[in-house]
């Protein structure tokens, strides 16, 4: 029987997209891959769309929640572990790969109780609670950033879709471009209201000659209001709730304005694209700021804090970048130097190695 891997990943695109990149690498080697997640996270749409089976657990995050949720936590976690054990038996998975997010904890514990090898991948520069708890139980632990602190962690980078790695170099992409500078605005898989609110106002204060072309991902509920803001400012912009073909968007852009989720940072590096990064200020342990500093220290980005951010400040930061193609190219090339293109293959190979000799 072919090797079988159960991938636990859920919640936001920051967990799901890297998990799908590893899944594709496993499937290319003949491994049977199934997913464990929730019915409410992005995995509920993205995983089936990519041709994988998703088994759902009744599980919710706890950090930052009210006291009632914490009081119910032991019962919810216990139930989720039992659900995960049933899924592992049903799928006859040889190995579990935890890709972070709260769904990883019950699936990882279930794997340990059944004697199945557990591999973990931590996407962020600050390790999440689930991975910190599970790391002592894991056979292999992989890190998306070199500064993340997990026991026995190996820095491999964050898995990224192959289509993004396959983009031409920044020099090749930028060489013959004509017309306005191309600005990609994206708030992660769920959008960012601060970017939706401030971008049109910042760009409206520019002349027609300096204003860039815009491709803006708003998140599910904010496309119409953002289109209206651009229309009121008399700015022509391509506005979408969600960009399905991120490789096309990154390949199109000269510069990005975005959040600093782990998947976003990895995709900017893989593509080779400089960025103005505005970390989500309420991220657990402020991990998006730590992610952003990775590219900023490499000379590939500038980090702005959301607190106090207004249209004037953003306009002042954008103007020199829009006016200087050599600066944009330097940022893009610096970003590309941070890419680790073999992350998905490395994690997939470790899962296959751990599956050796396991009778599911």
From Swiss-Prot:
SUPFAM superfamilies: UDP-Glycosyltransferase/glycogen phosphorylase (SSF53756). Pathway: Cell wall biogenesis; peptidoglycan biosynthesis. GO terms for cellular component: plasma membrane. One of its GO terms (biological process) is carbohydrate metabolic process. Its EC number is 2.4.1.227. Its main location: membrane. Keywords: Cell cycle, Cell division, Cell inner membrane, Cell membrane, Cell shape, Cell wall biogenesis/degradation, Glycosyltransferase, Membrane, Peptidoglycan synthesis, Transferase. It is a peripheral membrane protein. It catalyses: di-trans,octa-cis-undecaprenyl diphospho-N-acetyl-alpha-D-muramoyl-L-alanyl-D-glutamyl-meso-2,6-diaminopimeloyl-D-alanyl-D-alanine + UDP-N-acetyl-alpha-D-glucosamine = di-trans,octa-cis-undecaprenyl diphospho-[N-acetyl-alpha-D-glucosaminyl-(1->4)]-N-acetyl-alpha-D-muramoyl-L-alanyl-D-glutamyl-meso-2,6-diaminopimeloyl-D-alanyl-D-alanine + UDP + H(+). The keyword Signal does not apply. It is found in: Cell inner membrane. UDP-N-acetyl-alpha-D-glucosamine binds at residues 12-14, 124, 161, 189, 243, 288. One of its GO terms (molecular function) is undecaprenyldiphospho-muramoylpentapeptide beta-N-acetylglucosaminyltransferase activity. InterPro entries: GlcNAc_MurG, Glyco_trans_28_C, GlycoTrans_28_N. Cell wall formation. Catalyzes the transfer of a GlcNAc subunit on undecaprenyl-pyrophosphoryl-MurNAc-pentapeptide (lipid intermediate I) to form undecaprenyl-pyrophosphoryl-MurNAc-(pentapeptide)GlcNAc (lipid intermediate II). Belongs to the glycosyltransferase 28 family. MurG subfamily. This is UDP-N-acetylglucosamine--N-acetylmuramyl-(pentapeptide) pyrophosphoryl-undecaprenol N-acetylglucosamine transferase.
């Amino acid at each position: 029987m072919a090797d079988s891997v159960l991938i636990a990943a859920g919640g936001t695109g920051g967990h799901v997209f890297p998990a799908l990149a590893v899944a594709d690498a496993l499937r290319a080697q003949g491994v049977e891959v199934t997913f464990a997640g929730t019915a409410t996270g992005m995995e509920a749409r993205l995983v089936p769309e990519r041709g994988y089976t998703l088994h759902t657990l009744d599980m919710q995050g706890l950090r930052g929640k009210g006291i009632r949720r914490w009081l119910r936590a032991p019962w919810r976690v216990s139930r989720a572990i039992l659900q995960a054990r049933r899924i592992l038996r049903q799928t006859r998975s040889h190995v579990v790969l935890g890709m972070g997010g709260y769904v990883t904890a019950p699936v990882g514990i279930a794997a340990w109780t059944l004697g199945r090898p557990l591999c973990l991948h931590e996407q962020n520069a600050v390790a999440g609670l689930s991975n910190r708890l599970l790391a002592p139980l894991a056979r292999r632990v992989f890190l998306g950033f070199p500064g993340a602190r997990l026991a026995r962690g190996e820095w491999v980078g964050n898995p990224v879709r192959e289509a993004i790695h396959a983009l031409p170099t920044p020099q090749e992409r930028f060489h013959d471009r004509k017309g306005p500078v191309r600005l990609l605005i994206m708030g992660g898989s769920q959008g960012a209201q601060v970017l939706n609110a401030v971008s049109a106002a910042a760009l409206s204060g520019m002349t027609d000659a300096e204003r860039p072309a815009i491709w803006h991902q708003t998140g599910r509920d904010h496309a119409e209001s953002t289109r209206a803001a651009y229309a009121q400012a008399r700015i022509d912009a391509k506005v979408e709730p969600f960009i399905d073909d991120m490789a096309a968007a990154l390949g199109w852009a000269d510069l990005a304005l975005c959040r600093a989720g782990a998947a976003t940072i990895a995709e900017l590096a893989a593509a080779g694209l400089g960025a103005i990064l505005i970390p989500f200020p309420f991220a657990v342990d402020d991990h998006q700021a730590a992610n952003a500093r990775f590219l900023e220290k490499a000379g590939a980005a500038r980090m702005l804090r959301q607190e106090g951010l207004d249209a004037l400040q953003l306009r002042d930061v954008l103007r020199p970048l829009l006016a200087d193609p050599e600066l944009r190219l330097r940022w893009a090339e610096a970003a590309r130097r941070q890419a680790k293109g073999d992350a998905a293959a490395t994690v997939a190979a470790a899962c296959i190695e751990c599956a050796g000799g396991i009778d599911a």
